[in-house]
Amino acid sequence: MNRIARLVVLALVLLAGTAAWAQPAPAGKNLTVGILLVGPYNDHGWSQATYDGLSYAIAKVPGTKMVYVDKVNPADRPGTTASQLAESLVNQGAKMVIFNSDDMSDEAVKFATAHKDIFVIFLSGDTTWKEGKNFHDLPNMVCIMGKMEYMKMIAGVAAAMTTQSGKIGFLGPLINDETRRLAASAYLGAKYAWVNYRHQPLSKLDFKVTWIGFWFNIPGVTSDPTQVADDFFNSGYDVVISGIDTTEAVAEAAKYQAKGQTVWAIPYDYKDAINEGRGVSLGVPYFNWGPSIAVAAKAAMNGSWKSHWEWNGPDWKNINDPDKSAVGFNKGTLSKDAGAAVDKFIAELAKGLNLWKGPLNLQDGSQYLSSGQAATEKQIWYLPQLLEGMQGQSVSK
């Protein structure tokens, strides 16, 4: 074999090796999809939204079936890691594994690296975003997130149009880039409605964030979200926007209203979380994971899979379209004026209204966006602090 021929053979061998890692073999006509849920599958919040999203995909994509493990967190499963539990899904036949929490980031990367033949979806992550801060070259992984920022803005509008005291509380989970930007989005929506729809001075809007320390209550570890919600209501905050995975805010609002106190709440994540407090829930910003998971499953089956990062927005023709919109807002008990304001705001967003535009300062007074400057995706995704005008911690102590 001459030198040129040897080089050609070597190149083909290297290419074949690269291709094997570049894309797992297509699953073909049948695909078992496993999902790891950080909380209970029926938590009426984040985990149920992702569980239902996969259920939607299974119903839409012939040849697929589902296996799952829930309560994947240190409190419920001490000494057990997410990657170990992912192994258990593979042992049940899973050729695709979904990690459903930002808290699983390191474990998702560890598992994907060790299982190059398994398709991996990391919900809410950025590890496959080439321009992001946490990029890993993982050809078998796709990261998916919905642009919840829009829906949190809508929640802020609903809160600002409803509050009688001008005091809005935000019940936050742990502090990270995601939770900062979502709390800030709610503030931006509230600020916009307070000034432009209610024509009130911004100085009279009180927006306070209290973090509990995790996505849901872990007795003895986190602050109790029930107590935090109560503290808001007992301190004159008459609307509480939830940023945690579970429904304590709206449950407490219902209790307070039953005792004669006029308060409201806005749950999160799951479309039907609104049912936890009929009459006190102003609406719920929710994720609709099904369509994007269905697309990923089809790609894994037919060989069109490519590693990428996606940050999916709403379908502005109908933000609640179950087959097209990645995020939505399920309106609740809103006054006529508040409901009209929410509809008006959604229409403005659909036409291009951008609240992530300067002038905007960070909480410490430093400039975030100059006048007229629109934030980039990176500036929003990696928001380093809360915004000026918001009360509460910006970083973990």
Spell out what each predicted region is.
Residues 23-397:
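A residue-level marker of the well-folded mature domains of exported/periplasmic proteins
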Residues 1-9:
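Bacterial N-terminal signal peptides that target proteins for export
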Residues 8-19:
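Bacterial N-terminal signal peptides
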